[in-house]
């Protein structure tokens, strides 16, 4: 299989099949909800949808999202932006992606999902969190040193719910400390309600500037949900789920499937808390490329 074909296959699988850790979290959430409740029905429907999409190889959500590729820098000459764009255009032609890219000024549709700035491509070091996820069907240790490409698809509904706070925040009574960070995160969850297709996942960055904050927060969405959480992540997940917002905002025990937090250095004058929200359709996948 050549590189273009391998990337097309990556796009197809990412669009049609959830990672095992996300499926596991959804199934665990379904078991917690009261039988016959709105939350239980929503989660059952989500899981049925996932099974059908995986079996047919068709997109599991109509919004196939913004495509963001993280490419091991060792592959810079092999997996070029031109190669990636060719794969995206071919995947769109095959129906693995919908026509989902619009010129923000003219309103023109880029029917192959390819133009300047789309798809998004980042070349990163092999130790980047984006390349640390387990490759399907392989062990982490086996693939640790092999160059990889990771793809994440993020739909507009979840992207619209992402937000950034600047501390101190007088309206929240939030200062420049972890208590203030906690206030921002819980405020974001409360405001999101079910609009971002809950249950969701939060990627959080404490610090950084406005640009690196969003970048780091989004990268946290690539971390496995079954990875051992920090004490802060565990606490915030528990507190967010205690709000009772539930799947699709209809009430229930599971508002979030996970919280993943990173910290970045900041200048004295700024203290940002950035939250990248991902819906239940956390479509991410990694493939080795030799």
Regions found by a protein language model. Give the residues of each.
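Non-transmembrane, aqueous-exposed alpha-helical and coiled segments at domain scale
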Residues: 1-137, 143-204, 209-290
């Amino acid at each position: 299989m050549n590189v273009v074909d391998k990337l097309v296959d990556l796009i197809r699988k990412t669009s049609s099949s959830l990672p095992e850790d996300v499926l596991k979290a959804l199934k665990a959430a379904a078991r917690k909800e009261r039988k016959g409740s709105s939350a239980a029905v929503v989660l059952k429907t989500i899981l049925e949808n996932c099974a059908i999409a995986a079996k047919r190889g068709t997109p599991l959500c109509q919004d196939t999202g913004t495509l963001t590729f993280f490419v091991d820098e060792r592959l810079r000459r092999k997996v070029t932006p031109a190669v990636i764009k060719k794969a995206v255009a071919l995947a769109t032609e095959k129906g693995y992606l919908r026509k989902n890219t619009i010129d923000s000024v003219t309103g023109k549709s880029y029917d192959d999902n390819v133009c300047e700035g789309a798809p998004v491509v980042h070349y990163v070091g092999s130790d980047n969190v984006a390349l640390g996820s387990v490759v399907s069907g392989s062990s982490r240790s086996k693939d640790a040193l092999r160059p990889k490409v990771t793809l994440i698809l993020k739909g507009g509904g979840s992207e619209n719910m992402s937000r950034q706070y600047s501390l101190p925040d007088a309206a929240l009574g939030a200062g420049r400390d972890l208590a203030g960070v906690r206030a921002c995160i819980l405020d974001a969850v409360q405001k999101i309600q079910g609009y971002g297709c809950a249950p969701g996942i939060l990627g959080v960055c404490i610090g950084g500037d406005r640009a690196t904050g969003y970048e780091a927060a989004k990268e946290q969405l690539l971390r496995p949900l079954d990875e051992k959480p920090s004490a802060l992540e565990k606490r915030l997940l528990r507190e967010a789920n205690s709000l009772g917002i539930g799947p699709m905002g209809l009430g229930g025990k599971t508002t979030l499937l996970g919280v993943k937090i990173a910290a970045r250095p900041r200048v004295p004058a700024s203290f940002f808390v950035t939250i990248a929200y991902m819906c239940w359709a956390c479509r991410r996948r990694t493939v080795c490329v030799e």
